[in-house]
């Protein structure tokens, strides 16, 4: 198991604990409480996948955060916050790629939380890359504008977009939707890669083959989700 995956989970558990304390003191608004509930479900799922106890992970996460805060000077903290709080908009796709109409021979649509996943299940044995335009804050994907799947020839064969009726989504929502899209495309023997920018800010890591760091268990689950919907 990758040590970065474990430490990220541990820190996320502790930060969720801190946010829970804020909520318990009636200091959180409705969106804050909604994210808290969503992230709780996400942490339970990640803990089950990683085989880690959430309570133990929270304690270790606290130690990691305390060590970082102890080592960081006030000036370094101010500089980090100044850069991190500035939201950035990153673009894998051109305006033409974002606005281009596309058609599906065998359309498939699935709602994944507050996101809509669409794909053409007629596509087989293709090399596909996922590109996205999104905003980033704290070096993590904040809001997805649009994600599209392209073949090497430039044809659009899949898409993930926010649902207008369900505004607001989390980084985990986006990763789950990407998992659904990848699972559906790989079911037809396509090879799917994720853009380096998307890997960096959605997963904070990258694989040499361009794929997101899904575990074998997660991949089987994604494929099963698509098969059950077909």
Swiss-Prot record:
Annotated spans, RNA-binding and homodimerization: 1-73
Any one Gene Ontology cellular component term annotated for this protein: host cell nucleus
Region (Disordered): 206-230
One GO BP annotation of this record: symbiont-mediated suppression of host gene expression
A GO molecular-function annotation: protein serine/threonine kinase inhibitor activity
Nuclear export signal (motif): residue ranges: 137-146
Signal peptide feature range: none
Residue segments, region PABPN1-binding: 223-230
Keywords assigned by UniProt, alphabetized: Eukaryotic host gene expression shutoff by virus, Host cytoplasm, Host gene expression shutoff by virus, Host mRNA suppression by virus, Host nucleus, Host-virus interaction, Inhibition of host innate immune response by virus, Inhibition of host interferon signaling pathway by virus, Inhibition of host PKR by virus, Inhibition of host pre-mRNA processing by virus, Inhibition of host RIG-I by virus, Inhibition of host RLR pathway by virus, Interferon antiviral system evasion, RNA-binding, Ubl conjugation, Viral immunoevasion
InterPro entries: NS1 (IPR004208), NS1A (IPR000256), NS1A_effect_dom-like_sf (IPR038064), uS15_NS1_RNA-bd_sf (IPR009068)
Modifications after synthesis and translation: Upon interferon induction, ISGylated via host HERC5; this results in the impairment of NS1 interaction with RNA targets due to its inability to form homodimers and to interact with host EIF2AK2/PKR.
Record has Transferase as a keyword: no
Gene3D superfamilies: Influenza virus non-structural protein, effector domain (3.30.420.330), S15/NS1, RNA-binding (1.10.287.10)
Subcellular compartments: Host nucleus; Host cytoplasm
Region annotation (CPSF4-binding) ranges: 180-215
Motif position, Nuclear localization signal: 34-38
Record's function text: Inhibits post-transcriptional processing of cellular pre-mRNA, by binding and inhibiting two cellular proteins that are required for the 3'-end processing of cellular pre-mRNAs: the 30 kDa cleavage and polyadenylation specificity factor/CPSF4 and the poly(A)-binding protein 2/PABPN1. In turn, unprocessed 3' end pre-mRNAs accumulate in the host nucleus and are no longer exported to the cytoplasm. Cellular protein synthesis is thereby shut off very early after virus infection.
Family per record: Belongs to the influenza A viruses NS1 family.
UniProt xrefs under HAMAP family: INFV_NS1
Complex and partners: Homodimer. Interacts with host TRIM25 (via coiled coil); this interaction specifically inhibits TRIM25 multimerization and TRIM25-mediated RIGI CARD ubiquitination. Interacts with human EIF2AK2/PKR, CPSF4, IVNS1ABP and PABPN1.
Protein name: Non-structural protein 1
Organism: Influenza A virus (strain A/China:Nanchang/11/1996 H1N1)
Upper lineage: Viruses, Riboviria, Orthornavirae, Negarnaviricota, Polyploviricotina
């Amino acid at each position: 198991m990758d040590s970065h995956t474990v430490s990220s989970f541990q820190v996320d558990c502790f930060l969720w604990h801190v946010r829970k304390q804020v909520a318990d003191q009636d200091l959180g608004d409705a969106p804050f409480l909604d994210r808290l509930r969503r992230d709780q479900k996400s942490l339970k799922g990640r803990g089950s996948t990683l085989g880690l106890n959430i309570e133990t992970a929270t304690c270790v996460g606290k130690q990691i955060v305390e060590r970082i805060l102890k080592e960081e000077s006030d000036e370094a903290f101010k500089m980090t916050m100044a850069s991190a709080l500035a939201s950035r908009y990153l673009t894998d796709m051109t305006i033409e790629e974002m606005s281009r109409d596309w058609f599906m021979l065998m359309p498939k649509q699935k709602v994944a939380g507050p996101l809509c996943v669409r794909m053409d299940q007629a596509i087989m044995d293709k090399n596909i890359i996922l590109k996205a335009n999104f905003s980033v804050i704290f070096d993590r994907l904040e809001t997805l504008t649009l994600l599209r799947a392209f073949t090497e020839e430039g044809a659009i064969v899949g898409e993930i977009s926010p649902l207008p009726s369900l505004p607001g989504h989390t980084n985990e929502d986006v990763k789950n939707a990407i998992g659904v899209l990848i699972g559906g495309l790989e079911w037809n023997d396509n090879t799917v890669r994720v853009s380096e920018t998307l890997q960096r800010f959605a997963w904070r890591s990258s694989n040499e083959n361009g794929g997101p760091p899904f575990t074998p268990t997660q991949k089987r689950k994604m494929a099963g989700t698509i098969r059950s919907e077909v």
